[in-house]
Design a protein with these regions (language model features):
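Charged, amphipathic alpha-helical coiled-coil/dimerization segments
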Residues: 3-6, 35, 63, 85-148
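Pre-recognition alpha-helix immediately N-terminal to the DNA-recognition helix
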Residues: 26, 33, 53-56, 115, ...
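Short, locally clustered residues in the helix-turn-helix/winged-helix DNA-binding domain
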Residues: 28-31, 56-60, 121, 148
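Residues within the alpha-helical elements of helix-turn-helix
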Residues: 57, 72, 90
Length: 158
């Protein structure tokens, strides 16, 4: 039986569980690594990974309300709205009150936003590629599939 850690000679009553074996810790570290790579590769554009995701979602959807975009990028509406306001201030998106629902705002890419997204694409893809660079191509595909499986099964939690 593994010896239980003690502090000041007091038995803590738990077996050690190294951080490097904890899924939550590893996911957080991988996220930190990816954000650092994204910022390194995309620094010239002054866009965060979240803003890039929102621009990408709008490129696919054309027009979408803020609630839909929040769901697309798996964030709460408040955080999403703040990011959209910053993109709007830089003229990368348009936000307008919807005619059918005065409480909702419809968003769409501007020509500037579409051009930015196009210019960023190579650098952003390089950040994603470099995040998984230590894995073989087959392991990269397997890793993505495993992450998709976990998100599909438990995505409702957040």
């Amino acid at each position: 039986m593994a010896k239980k850690p003690t502090r000041g000679g007091v038995d803590r009553g738990v077996d050690p569980w190294p951080l490097g074996q904890r899924p939550g810790f590893l996911v957080r570290r991988l996220h930190q690594i990816h954000v650092a790579l994204f910022q390194e590769k995309c620094a010239e554009f002054e866009i965060t990974p979240l803003q890039y995701s929102l621009l990408s979602a709008l490129a696919v959807r054309g027009t979408a309300d803020q609630t839909t975009l929040a769901a697309d990028v798996a964030l709460d509406r408040t955080t999403t709205t703040g990011a959209l306001k910053r993109l709007h201030a830089r003229r990368f998106i348009e936000r307008a009150v919807r005619r059918d629902d005065r409480r909702a705002r419809a968003c769409r890419l501007t020509a500037m936003g579409a051009a930015l997204l196009s210019r960023m694409e190579t650098a952003a893809r390089a950040a994603h590629r470099d995040t998984l660079a230590s894995l073989s191509k087959s392991d990269q595909k397997r890793f993505i599939a495993l992450m998709q499986q976990i998100v599909a099964a438990d995505g409702f939690r957040a």
